[in-house]
């Protein structure tokens, strides 16, 4: 793909578009800050206000050297009309100003050749006389196999040599000599050109894809099969770009990264606007698309697009992005960020051919598997989840869970400042208390019981404490969240990034970070 980058937010290039069952054809992509434009070439009359005209009639004379000054490809054998594939410099076809590469020849001297084979059209043009009148119409979606140049400035030099053979996929130069004695010459009728009209080939909008909350993918929908050098972009309203085919994997990745960057910038800007309407404890940290892997799917579609959002204390899973306040109450699923475990997967842990995956284990032990498109998307998600967890732990400071110790109802408080506190649920009397730094290990039975191994600060001996919970995974994940927040407080880089993120999503000042007790 040939492209030029005008600035960080814009990019222009030419690629192929596979739209439904049609043959791929050339389109121009133009990436703006908030829009991806797909454009196709067309020929417009630009005398006065530009307008489309389906057909043009052009009369040109044959030259001794160079003939008509054009070459053709295609034909009925490929289910398309014959198309002008080259126009020679400073020859009759170019000087007329009315013929363009990509024009389909519909009539020759009034004879309908729309459904003629390539060689038949060549013969008609050979025998057309010194002057020929062509009725043409620009073939906007010329199949890519014709390999037509995008621009008119092809290096096609005039020649007076003739060819005895022609091929529908090779340029047949129509500079052939006129044969006046040929009895098969077809009769002519007068088709005058339109005086005073000027025509130009231009790129015209074919499809507009708004980028706010748009998604893109290199994979065949619902599968882990990656298309080679291909991708598609889908707008939030479901409008799809079609399959965009690049010349190389590098070009494809350049486009995906540029599109992803613009989508990300739009999302961040939108989050800032939405957060003005939410209190400090309900600020949005992240919004974006990913694909969820369906567990034990019996259908061909293993992956389904889902929209994830981190807001306040919750992770929301939507089928489509929330637009109104009411939409936030209709999430497909909602999880407490402190009670879920997120893990970015290494290549050796992936379940299939999709890269850039992460898992989440819910508070009830359900394992969820997600895929994103780019490595940068995965890094962005990981940072956002860490930030959301940190902010929530800082906000709540402590979390208490009911538990059972030797058939007695107890409570376990996980406190960000002091550590672990176990107390009698009835009397509130504290049974034991340990700091986070005293926890040297733990184990669980995967059902309800957790065994904590604490180090006594005086004797240095390990003391085992076993508690039974009705919500085992929620407790385990909450403990992990508090430990992660403690570790984050010791990381200057994280604290710097977290401060910037907090300032972006909230006007409230960040509470002072507490260090490991």
Curated annotation (Swiss-Prot):
Xref: InterPro entries: PDZ, PDZ_sf, PH-like_dom_sf, PH_domain, Syntrophin, Syntrophin_4th
> Which GO molecular function, any one, fits this protein according to its record?
actin binding
Compartment(s): Cytoplasm, Cytoskeleton; Nucleus
**One GO CC annotation:** nucleus
Which keywords does UniProt give here?
Actin-binding, Cytoplasm, Cytoskeleton, Nucleus
Which CDD domains does the UniProt record give?
A: PDZ_syntrophin-like (cd06801)
Q: Known Pfam families for this protein?
A: PDZ, Syntrophin_4th
Any idea where the PH domain is? 283-390
Enumerate the Gene3D superfamilies for this protein: 2.30.42.10, Pleckstrin-homology domain (PH domain)/Phosphotyrosine-binding domain (PTB)
Keyword Transit peptide found: no
Q: What is its main location?
A: cytoplasm
**SMART domains for the chain:** PDZ (SM00228)
What are the residue boundaries of the PDZ domain, all occurrences included?
A: 57-140
In the UniProt entry, what is the domain comment? The PDZ domain binds to the last three or four amino acids of DGKZ. The association with dystrophin or related proteins probably leaves the PDZ domain available to recruit proteins to the membrane.
General function of this protein = Adapter protein that binds to and probably organizes the subcellular localization of a variety of proteins. May link various receptors to the actin cytoskeleton and the dystrophin glycoprotein complex. May participate in regulating the subcellular location of diacylglycerol kinase-zeta to ensure that diacylglycerol is rapidly inactivated following receptor activation.
The annotated subunit structure for this chain is: Interacts with the dystrophin protein DMD and related proteins DTNA and DTNB. Interacts with DGKZ.
The family assignment reads: Belongs to the syntrophin family.
> PANTHER family this protein is in?
GAMMA-1-SYNTROPHIN, SYNTROPHIN
Q: What is this protein called?
A: Gamma-1-syntrophin
The organism encoding this protein is Mus musculus
Q: Tell me the name of the encoding gene.
A: Sntg1
